[in-house]
Every structure is written in C-alpha cells, then in structure tokens.
Amino acid sequence: MGSKEVDLRLNLVESHINNNQYQLALQELLKVEAAAKHMSRFHFDSGMIYLGLQELEQSREGFARAVEIDEDFGEAWNNLGKIEEALGRDKDAEAAYRKAFSILTYVTPEFSAYNLGMLLLRQGRAKEAEEFGRKALARNWLYIPAYKLLADAFVAQNRLDDAEAVLKSGLEADMNSTSTILALAEHKMRMGKTAEAAVLFDRIVKQFPNSSEAKAARNYLEFLQ
C-alpha cells in the first residue's frame, strides 16, 4: 500500500472518528496497520478510537506509542494526560500535561495548561492551579473555561474579589458565555451580592432560555423570591 493510499485511508478513519463512528473507524484503521504502524498519526487515531469506545487502557497504548514515535506531538501528550488522569494515575497525567505545554509547536497549549490546572486544583494545589490558569489565558484569552479555573483557584485561596474580577474578564471575552454568566452569578451569591446575582440569573433566563444553564438560573430566581 502506497503512502498516498495510506493517507487517504487515514483521512477516512478520522472522518469516522469525527462522526463518532468508532467501530467503522477501527475497521478502516486495521486495514492500514501493516503499512502505517510506524506513523504517530496511526497510533494517535488508534488512541482516539479506543477512547470513543471507552477502552481506556488500549487508548492509552495508542497515545503512548504516538509520543514514542514523535516526542513533540503535543496533542497526543495532552490526550495521554487525560487518559492517565481517568485511570487514576495523577502523577503520570501531570507529567504528560507538563510535557504537552512545554512543546512550542503545540497549536493549542491552553488545553494542556487548563487540564493541568484542573488536576492541580483537584489535588488542593491552588496556587499552582492559578499559575496554569494564567498560562492558559496567556496563550489564548478567548479560552473561556480557563477563566472559571482561575476563579476557582482564587476561591480556594479565599481571594473572592480576585475571583469576581476574573469572571468579569471572562464575560468581557465572550458576552454570550452562559457558563460564565452563571458562574459569576453564583459567585455573587456566595459573596452576599444577591441583587446583582439576580440580575445575571434573569439575563440567562431571558436571553438564553434554551441553554443548559437556564434551568439552574430559574431555580436560583425561585429561591431568591
């Protein structure tokens, strides 16, 4: 099988992955194994397929092999970190996230910074989580989940005003982020600013009635009445 045919078949594999058709993707992947098993792309696709099939150990094998072949494969390192974390191997997950973030050619380093920050926060390492929340936003200030991470890191350090400020910054980055509006409203509730919180809950209900956050906002408004 020539390299052009391998490339075309891997394109088909990835199309199936993107459409959540993991069994079809695996069938196509196995057809090119003999010709493509030396490629990091082949093993990355394998990792993605087994992740979709909830076969975490086999998914881990795919991503681990991908980074063995290409040590600078940032996305594979990040995904390996997520699998290690899901398997309860926090130390290995942290190492993989740190490696991903250190790769200068990795196009989306904010993902690994965020994932690492969330891991650190879960472990009670709030100051380090703050550092990686900041790093995620330094790489991509439009990556909205990082604002919530940074705010939660501040809350864990009892820096409530800083948490409020960073959530407001997140809202400035994306005025239509219902998750950020809800997070800011909930934070204002914790700070006793119930009138300001009610305005934000009302905004979600009126402007984004079909959002997943609208139900929570309605419940808060009923509680505040």
PLM segments and residue spans:
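Structural marker of alpha-solenoid helical repeat scaffolds
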Residues: A35, I69, I103-T105, R139, ...
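Residue-level recognition of tetratricopeptide repeat
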Residues: E5, M39, F73, V107-P109, ...
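TPR alpha-solenoid repeat register
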Residues: L8, F42, A76, I83, ...
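Terminal, low-structured helical/coil segments at or just beyond the last alpha-helical repeat
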Residues: S3, G170, D174-Q225
